A protein has these predicted regions:
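Membrane-helix interface linkers and caps
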Residues: 1-9, 32-52
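Membrane-embedded catalytic scaffold of the fatty acid hydroxylase/desaturase
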Residues: 14-33, 37-38, 53-201
Length: 201
């Protein structure tokens, strides 16, 4: 918490917060994506399909929440891989990997260009998911929330996702680690050992 690396995390977090406050209104918004996709679906299909009527609202809400969580995780995984694989993107992402000691604020140690990429990724995922579900299910679409977060995001964070960048090394039962990355696995991702480079995305 008091190391030079931690203080660098705090500074980068503060600078990025200021930059994103200025840039956010100018970055692609999920509402824009949702509108464009929703409008395109109306051009592709004449009217909304009536085959999907009569489905219980809770089923739609749970399906939408799960779909959004899975698509978001899938997109985050691939963007993270590309940040390591593409030299230009690595030049941004290496700022995050420059931390010599992990703490919960290390998650915010990102180059502003990386923050913009993740913002665009989020807008695309949320916009596409919202448009598709609203097209097929109309105003029955809602998220299943716990304390202001998607139930799946809440459970994921409760299981230790928020500890990925902390010095606490928590492992899950091996079959769970095949699906969800534990903090211990993410610590390996940040390791500088040769055998750990570009592992555990």
């Amino acid at each position: 918490w008091g190391s030079a690396s931690a203080f660098a995390d705090y500074k980068v977090m503060f600078i990025n917060a200021l930059l994103m406050t200025l840039l956010s209104p100018r970055i692609l918004a999920k509402a824009t994506v949702a509108y464009l996709i929703f409008d395109s679906l109306h051009l592709l299909f004449e009217g909304r399909p009536s085959v999907l009527t009569g489905i219980p609202q809770w089923t739609i809400a749970l399906s939408f929440t799960l779909f959004l969580f899975i698509l978001d995780d899938f997109a985050r995984y691939w963007l993270h891989r590309w940040l390591h694989a593409i030299p230009l993107l690595w030049s941004f992402h290496k700022v995050h990997h420059s931390a010599s000691a992990l703490n919960p604020f290390t998650v915010f140690r990102t180059h502003p260009a990386e923050a913009i990429l993740f913002s665009v990724r989020s807008a695309l995922v949320q916009g596409i998911s919202t448009a598709v579900f609203f097209f097929f299910f109309g105003n029955q679409v809602t998220l299943v929330m716990v304390l202001g977060a998607s139930i799946f995001t809440f459970a994921f964070n409760l299981l230790g996702s928020n500890l990925r960048h902390s010095p606490v090394s928590i492992s899950y039962w091996h079959p769970i680690e095949l699906i969800l990355m534990s903090p211990a696995q993410h610590h390996i991702h940040h390791s500088t050992a040769e055998e750990h480079i570009d592992r555990n995305f």
